[in-house]
Protein backbone atom coordinates (compact mmCIF):
# COMPACT_ATOMS: atom_id res chain seq x y z
CA UNK A 1 0.00 0.00 0.00
CA UNK A 2 1.14 3.52 -0.56
CA UNK A 3 0.48 6.41 1.77
CA UNK A 4 -0.67 9.58 0.09
CA UNK A 5 -1.30 13.02 1.53
CA UNK A 6 0.24 12.83 4.99
CA UNK A 7 -1.44 16.08 6.01
CA UNK A 8 -3.66 14.37 8.59
CA UNK A 9 -3.05 14.97 12.29
CA UNK A 10 -1.62 12.14 14.44
CA UNK A 11 -5.07 11.66 15.99
CA UNK A 12 -6.59 11.20 12.54
CA UNK A 13 -3.92 8.65 11.62
CA UNK A 14 -4.48 6.71 14.85
CA UNK A 15 -8.20 6.55 14.14
CA UNK A 16 -7.53 5.31 10.61
CA UNK A 17 -5.11 2.66 11.85
CA UNK A 18 -7.64 1.49 14.44
CA UNK A 19 -10.40 1.29 11.85
CA UNK A 20 -8.11 -0.58 9.44
CA UNK A 21 -7.16 -3.04 12.18
CA UNK A 22 -10.83 -3.54 13.03
CA UNK A 23 -11.62 -4.30 9.39
CA UNK A 24 -8.80 -6.87 9.22
CA UNK A 25 -10.03 -8.61 12.38
CA UNK A 26 -13.62 -8.54 11.11
CA UNK A 27 -12.55 -10.12 7.82
CA UNK A 28 -10.64 -12.84 9.69
CA UNK A 29 -13.77 -13.57 11.78
CA UNK A 30 -15.95 -13.73 8.66
CA UNK A 31 -13.44 -16.03 6.94
CA UNK A 32 -13.44 -18.37 9.95
CA UNK A 33 -9.72 -17.83 10.55
CA UNK A 34 -10.33 -16.71 14.14
CA UNK A 35 -13.24 -16.87 16.55
CA UNK A 36 -13.74 -13.53 18.26
CA UNK A 37 -16.16 -10.76 19.11
CA UNK A 38 -15.44 -7.06 18.59
CA UNK A 39 -16.77 -4.66 21.22
CA UNK A 40 -17.00 -1.44 19.23
CA UNK A 41 -17.90 0.61 22.32
CA UNK A 42 -14.52 0.09 23.99
CA UNK A 43 -12.51 -1.05 20.96
CA UNK A 44 -11.65 -4.44 22.42
CA UNK A 45 -11.51 -7.84 20.76
CA UNK A 46 -12.51 -10.91 22.78
CA UNK A 47 -11.10 -14.14 21.38
CA UNK A 48 -13.26 -17.24 21.69
CA UNK A 49 -12.45 -20.93 21.58
CA UNK A 50 -12.84 -22.71 18.26
CA UNK A 51 -16.30 -24.38 18.36
CA UNK A 52 -15.07 -27.05 15.92
CA UNK A 53 -12.83 -28.60 18.56
CA UNK A 54 -15.92 -29.73 20.51
CA UNK A 55 -17.66 -31.58 17.68
Swiss-Prot record:
Domain of life assignment: Eukaryota
* InterPro entries in alphabetical order: CSN3, PCI_dom, WH-like_DNA-bd_sf, WH_DNA-bd_sf
Q: What is its main location?
A: cytoplasm
Q: Name one GO biological process term.
A: red, far-red light phototransduction
Q: Where is the PCI domain?
A: 1-52
Alphabetized SUPFAM superfamilies for the sequence: Winged helix' DNA-binding domain
Q: Where in the cell is it found?
A: Cytoplasm; Nucleus
Q: List all membrane-crossing ranges.
A: none
GO CC terms of this entry? COP9 signalosome; cytoplasm
**Keyword Glycoprotein listed:** no
Keyword entries, A-Z: Cytoplasm, Developmental protein, Nucleus, Phytochrome signaling pathway, Signalosome
**Gene3D superfamilies given in the database record:** Winged helix-like DNA-binding domain superfamily/Winged helix DNA-binding domain (1.10.10.10)
- Known function: Component of the COP9 signalosome complex (CSN), a complex involved in various cellular and developmental processes such as photomorphogenesis and auxin and jasmonate responses. The CSN complex is an essential regulator of the ubiquitin (Ubl) conjugation pathway by mediating the deneddylation of the cullin subunits of SCF-type E3 ligase complexes, leading to decrease the Ubl ligase activity of SCF. It is involved in repression of photomorphogenesis in darkness by regulating the activity of COP1-containing Ubl ligase complexes.
Q: Which family does it belong to?
A: Belongs to the CSN3 family.
* Subunit structure, interactors included: Component of the CSN complex, probably composed of CSN1, CSN2, CSN3, CSN4, CSN5 (CSN5A or CSN5B), CSN6 (CSN6A or CSN6B), CSN7 and CSN8.
Entry protein name:
COP9 signalosome complex subunit 3
- Lineage of this protein's species? Eukaryota, Viridiplantae, Streptophyta, Embryophyta, Tracheophyta
Amino acid sequence: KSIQGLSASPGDLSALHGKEAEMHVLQMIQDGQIHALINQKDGMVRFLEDPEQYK
